[in-house]
């Protein structure tokens, strides 16, 4: 297991605040199973894996933003039904 330092991550991110935001979003993606890790998991927690990906320059805001784009979901049928008019 490789040790991850803040300094390693800051080489790829502008400041600590952005590092926290980016690593949080990526860790959530990994924890919920939405995305596959880009580094070996090595029995680490999702937060550590996210920081390792950032430190190696594999994850940035463009990669996170691409994953957050969600297709519009159709409205429920109840909203399309004319019998549900406002009183």
Swiss-Prot record:
A GO biological-process term: DNA-templated transcription
Cellular component terms (Gene Ontology): DNA-directed RNA polymerase complex
GO molecular function: DNA binding; DNA-directed RNA polymerase activity
Domain of life: Bacteria
UniProt family annotation: Belongs to the RNA polymerase subunit omega family.
Quaternary state and interactors: The RNAP catalytic core consists of 2 alpha, 1 beta, 1 beta' and 1 omega subunit. When a sigma factor is associated with the core the holoenzyme is formed, which can initiate transcription.
Protein name: DNA-directed RNA polymerase subunit omega
Organism of provenance: Pseudomonas fluorescens (strain ATCC BAA-477 / NRRL B-23932 / Pf-5)
Recorded name of the encoding gene: rpoZ
